[in-house]
A protein has these predicted regions:
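Long, distal/terminal scaffolding or interaction modules
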Residues: 1-170
Length: 170
């Protein structure tokens, strides 16, 4: 069962507020062409990733908070345009894949341990006041391409709106 899944979605399971995405499981607020995600929250245009929070354009990554344009990153926060990072430290391609294989991400026990570490990363990450992207004269949070909006939340591609939740051009 998924709630509020609209606009060109395929294979969305146990998720809420998903648009223009496919192969999504256990996610909330996923938009703009995301694909093959598990346990993502407030994600845009991510691919083949798990446990991402507030991330955009990330590929093949796990356990990230507020990361943008990252590829093959793991257990990190507040990264921009990075590749092969583990626990907020740069690594080589070989080191990265060696560490990932050593962690055995398919094991439920290993995942529970990583989730505890991820909880600490979320607690210590730096968060923006509001997530506004290409917005003008707008108040609210989780907004994309909004002009003249007042108290809008999870809204994108709209103009002259007030007191909206989950609004977008259709």
């Amino acid at each position: 069962l998924s709630v509020s899944v609209v606009r060109d979605c395929e294979n969305v399971f146990y998720s809420k507020s998903v648009d223009k995405s496919r192969d999504i499981v256990d996610c909330i607020s996923i938009i703009n062409g995301s694909e093959s995600l598990y346990e993502n929250v407030e994600a845009q245009s991510n691919y083949n990733s798990q446990y991402l929070l507030l991330c955009k354009n990330c590929i093949d990554s796990y356990y990230l908070v507020d990361c943008v344009n990252c590829t093959n990153c793991f257990l990190s926060s507040n990264l921009r345009n990075k590749e092969f990072w583990i626990r907020n430290k740069q690594s080589t391609r070989d080191e990265y894949f060696k560490e990932i294989n050593k962690l055995n991400l398919k094991s439920r026990v290993a995942r529970n341990i990583l989730l505890k570490e991820f909880k600490e990363i979320k607690k210590n990450a730096i968060y923006r006041f509001a997530n506004l992207t290409r917005c003008v004269d707008t108040t609210g949070n989780y907004l994309l391409n909004v002009k003249n909006g007042k108290n809008c939340f999870e809204v994108y591609n709209v103009e002259n709106s007030k007191y909206c939740y989950r609004g977008f051009d259709y």
